[in-house]
Amino acid sequence: MATALITGASQGIGACIAERLAKDGYNIAINHYPSDGDKANAEKVAETCRSYGVEVALFPANVADYAQCEEMVKAVKKQFGGIDALVNNAGITKDGLLLRMSEEQYDAVIAVNQKSVFNMMKLVGAVMLRQKHGRIVSLASVAGLYGNPGQMNYSASK
């Protein structure tokens, strides 16, 4: 059975993608930010996914941190034997007008929304090359094309 790793799958679009892929027969590796609230949400998503008869596991990691991504990918590979699909879904917003935006607000959004894609594609891409198969989907936003007031950092990251 194929395995999909979805980043930011504890809520929103990521949760919906996890549930749909489970319905389609994929085993599901749910990544969530390592916090109690995100873990509780991820457990609810996992319960729904398991109702489709697939194997599901939670993998807490801050995907903006390369070392945490590396450990997560190793753990997913160990648990499921490989990774057939990666969905780069994790994303955050820290809205504010540019002249009032702190460098920390800007950097946090870029790290999660952009650097995480690099981290995951580099690590999972290597797994997929060794397997000689795999699929990667990276989510974007219309904000990356048109921008939104107060979302300079988010728009730049998408």
For each of these PLM feature ranges, what is it?
Residues 10-11, 34:
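Conserved glycine-rich cofactor-binding loop
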Residues 141:
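Residue(s) in the substrate-gating loop at a strand-loop-helix junction
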Residues 26-42:
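Conserved glycine-rich Rossmann-like NAD(P)H-binding loop of the short-chain dehydrogenase/reductase
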Residues 121, 157:
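Active-site helix of classical SDR
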Residues 60-72, 103:
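The beta1-alpha1 cofactor-binding region of Rossmann-like NAD(H)/NADP(H)-dependent oxidoreductases
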Residues 99, 146-152:
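Active-site loop immediately N-terminal to the catalytic Tyr-X3-Lys motif
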Residues 97-98, 105-107:
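Substrate-binding pocket helix/loop in short-chain dehydrogenase/reductase
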